[in-house]
Amino acid sequence: MDGPAQQTDTVMAEAAAAQQPAPPSQPVAGIDNIPATLSHGGRFIQYNIFGNVFEVTAKYKPPIMPIGKGAYGIVCSALNSETNEHVATKKIANAFDNKIDAKRTLREIKLLRHMDHENIVAIRDIIPPPQREAFNDVYIAYELMDTDLHQIIRSNQGLSEEHCQYFLYQILRGLKYIHSANVLHRDLKPRNLLLNANCDLKICDFGLARVTSETDFMTEYVVTRWYRPPELLLNSSDYTAAIDVWSVGCIFMELMDRKPLFPGRDHVQQLRLLMELIGTPSEAEMEFLNENAKRYIRQLPLYRRQSFVEKFPHVNPAAIDLVEKMLTFDPRRRLTVEDALAHPYLTSLHDISDEPVCTTPFSFDFEQHALTEEQMKELIYREGLAFNPEYQHM
């Protein structure tokens, strides 16, 4: 898959360099010579990162560099001395303390192990614990990327339309594969779209993903508010792959306009912002909603649809046409990913022979029963052994 040749490396490299905090390929300033201590007979190495133990198998030799820290834990870049590949290793501390978070971790591991696509981030390793009975922290090594779309949008670096178009194409190309696996991502946003200096884009964070045929959807927080479609804002439980398409439309306009399209402070304002742009839906467009949702919309002020072309005069009219078809109120009338890829705006990139699908639908069967903490530990432990069979008898 070839991307835009013009200025690609320079623009992305400069954009990455301009960001705060440092992108994942850069060490955090001031962190040098992190001490390493061999443990468990030399089979593991312990590092002290921000006062936390970071313990990985001995193939991840020094130096190791912290590249991110969040509520989930710490991420470090490390070199796998066996494959000579740099990876981003995420430590999820006390991963089994919260059952919902543990299930998210298990779901992401199983999904990413199932998928194999250029535009979906790959898991390179799941590091087994030194002792099975003391298994509390989960370490997952992903392929290392340079930055994410959120950082690029927030940087002051200009991007050509060619770059934006190529990013959109890759998101849709990856999403076609995801949807063909019978999976909805459900949390697409700029932070979950990773980039490298070649403009390669990879979708990440599948912790909220779900099977498309599932009916009991509303058990967890789904889709960051700004990228949430009307059917979710109105509590429709019967949603489809169209939710991801809406999110992509919002992301693309944010990329073109360098600010969020619908930055709502809460559910109520979020719905108002999107209706101020796309207009109050007709009765026909509300057919899919329940009576309570219809009643709520009818009592709101009447909003007239704005002209996207007039509101965004700097955006290519062909791009506007595509976005308008992705941001339709009625999910049944929203473009599918395949339709979006075939849109005239993407003609220069679209190649159906190079847009693979997943041949085997993903099964969420492991979630059909209420898993205990110990069962989730065992399932993740087995995934680690699949990468590291030599640690079977530790």
Swiss-Prot record:
Residues 1-27 are annotated as: Disordered. A motif (TXY) lies at residues 219-221. SMART domains: S_TKc. It is an enzyme of class 2 (transferase). Its cofactor is Mg(2+). Coiled coil: none annotated. Activated by threonine and tyrosine phosphorylation. The keyword Kinase applies. Pfam families: Pkinase. Residues 1-10 have a biased composition (Polar residues). The keyword Phosphoprotein applies. The modification Phosphotyrosine is found at residue 221. Its EC number is 2.7.11.24. Induction: Not induced by wounding and UV-C treatment. InterPro entries: Kinase-like_dom_sf (IPR011009), MAP_kinase (IPR050117), MAP_kinase_CS (IPR003527), Prot_kinase_dom (IPR000719), Ser/Thr_kinase_AS (IPR008271). Expressed constitutively in roots, stems, flowers and fruits of the hot pepper (cv. Subicho). The TXY motif contains the threonine and tyrosine residues whose phosphorylation activates the MAP kinases. This is Mitogen-activated protein kinase 2. The lineage of its organism: Eukaryota, Viridiplantae, Streptophyta, Embryophyta, Tracheophyta. The gene is MK2.
